Amino acid sequence: IYDDVWMMQHFGVRYKRSKIFDDIEALAAYFQNEMGLRKGDVFTIFMPTTVQSIITFYALNKIGVITSFVHPLMGPDYLKEQLEVLHSKGVMVLDLLVKDHIGVINDSGLPCIVCNSSDYSEGFKKYGCKVGEGLIKGIFPKYNKAVYYKDVVKTTARVVGEINNADDIAAYLNGGGTTGKSKTIKLTSRSINELTCRVSDIDEIHDPGEEAEVIVLPLFHCFGLIIAVHMAMCNSARI
């Protein structure tokens, strides 16, 4: 219902809805056609809150794949446990996390999508990110089954996606729990959208794409995923 307004902003660079939707489509097609992901499979996002992690969640949801959000500051043993327990079919990781986690990811044998800070940067900030990325590549080992995010979203491939999947699980979140080990929270597409509808009035976005909301909460947190990100985007705020 909205025009091609500004949808996201990263390092001062704005991106319109058309660009974000194109990247969602390209990723969804890659997951289905190249990685062979199917409805009910699990894919792990081991990332902070970034443009890439938000786009990837929607791409996975389009084809009925469950997103497992894992806190990027958790250690390699925890990541290994989550990959195994949830039977993840792949993982997305930020290049800055390579030092402590490349061993676990390579040992898992899972395909990996590597994200760079420069993916959605421009100008001097992009150049600065590129310098750091070059140093990382020169110092640390490489992922065995890796493709770079920036290469995936270059394509124009499209897929139909799953229809009427409201009651399917959309995401796994890891709660702290009151006792014992971390608990896995299951969120359906319906629960995400119903909560968004019930509280969407608190946003009151009057100028789509121009009024912005700063996202400081993580996606592995229910409030961060649903209220801070999904609700804001549904109300046409620029995030």
Sequence positions of predicted segments:
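Conserved ATP-dependent adenylate/AMP-binding module captured primarily in the ANL superfamily
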Residues: 74-106, 195-214
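Conserved AMP-binding/adenylate-forming core of the ANL superfamily
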Residues: 6-38, 44-50, 54-58, 75-80, ...
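N-lobe entry segment of adenylate-forming
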Residues: 1-34, 39, 119-143, 160-163
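Conserved structural elements of the adenylate-forming
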Residues: 21-27, 152-156, 166, 185-206
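Conserved AMP-binding A3 loop
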Residues: 16-18, 161-163, 170-197
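Conserved pre-ATP/AMP-binding loop-to-beta segment of ANL
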Residues: 125, 137-174, 181, 205-212
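Conserved AMP-binding/adenylation subdomain of ANL enzymes
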Residues: 64, 193-212, 220-239
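Short beta-strand->loop structural element characteristic of the AMP-binding/adenylate-forming
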Residues: 44-46, 53, 57, 61-94, ...
